[in-house]
Each structure stands twice: as structure tokens, then as C-alpha cells.
Amino acid sequence: MKNTVVVYLEHQIEEMGVPDHIANALKPHLKIVSRNNSVSIRDVGKILSAVTLLSGDILQNGSYLQGWIDVLITLLVSKVIRPDLHDRFLSLSFTEDDLEDYFDATVQRRTYRIDDEYNAEFDHYTMSQFYSWLYLAKGGNFPDDEDGMKKFVGGLFSRWSGGPDDPQSIPRKVKRDWLELFKAQ
């Protein structure tokens, strides 16, 4: 069953004409973060207001890679519902516990198989968000990469097989290019 804020978000997205590439990232994001964080109808309004103020061509151009859009959505939403984490996302100074808490990314939700059995609690979006931010914080390095997570997550941020050149700069670039409303020329 959907919670009230997700239903409200979906209605407002439709009413406001939020572009699909933004809406399709915002809906699952709010769904997972509302499991473990307090999100009000007013918060949804603040988030959607921020969406309408995005700069650059992010609203018109749906060809950006999913990882970049997910970083944008995390920065937008965390600034409203978890301002204590927003700066840590931006500077990549969060802990794994912060990620688990914000995304409700329990081991069960981010692990496809447990003891060689399919895990019914696995949630692909939760796993993707958790490991994307871990990838950025670790500069694209996963020491124990038995599941090929580095290649999967790197593909969310770069069309090239090696991943992005400087993963740790991505949150700052997203802020600079899409979130900063007023830039000195």
C-alpha cells in the first residue's frame, strides 16, 4: 500500500508536468526514504518547488545518465527532509550507517541472494542508491567486488566501461550545474 506522501507526490507531479526523467527518479526515491524518515506533505511541496527551479538543461534534456539524476534527486530531497545529511552527501563525508539509515538500506534490502537463495526483501532501487553513493565516496573503488558492483554502478555515471574520471566530484558538479540558481558571471 502506498503511503500518503507518495500518492500526493504522484498527483502533484502529474499536475505540474514534471519531466518523466525527473519524476521517474523522484517517485522511487521518496518511496524508499519515507520508510525511515519523516516526510510531510509540506516537504513534498518544498521538493517540487525546488524541482521547478532547477537550472541548466536538466529539465528539458532526458538523456542524462541515471546516476547523475539520482545524485540530483538525493541532494534535492535530503536538503528538505534530512538537512543534517545534505552537506555530508555533498562532501561525501557520510558513513555507511548514514546511507543505511537514509535509504533504509538494510542488508536484506540491498542483497539479491542470501545463503544462495533468492531474497524476497531485495529492493533494486535501494541497492542501487546505497552502492551509488558508496561508489562516489570511495572514488569508484570497491575492494570486495565479487558481484561486479563497480561495473554496474560505474555504468550509472558514465557511458565508458571504466566509469567516470572523477566520481568524487559528481555531487559538487550536480550542485554547481543544476542546483545553484544564481551564478556570478
Residue ranges and their predicted role:
Residues 13-185:
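The feature marks long, low-complexity, polar/acidic/proline-rich intrinsically disordered regions embedded
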Residues 1-12:
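Conserved AAA+ ATPase core "coupling" helix
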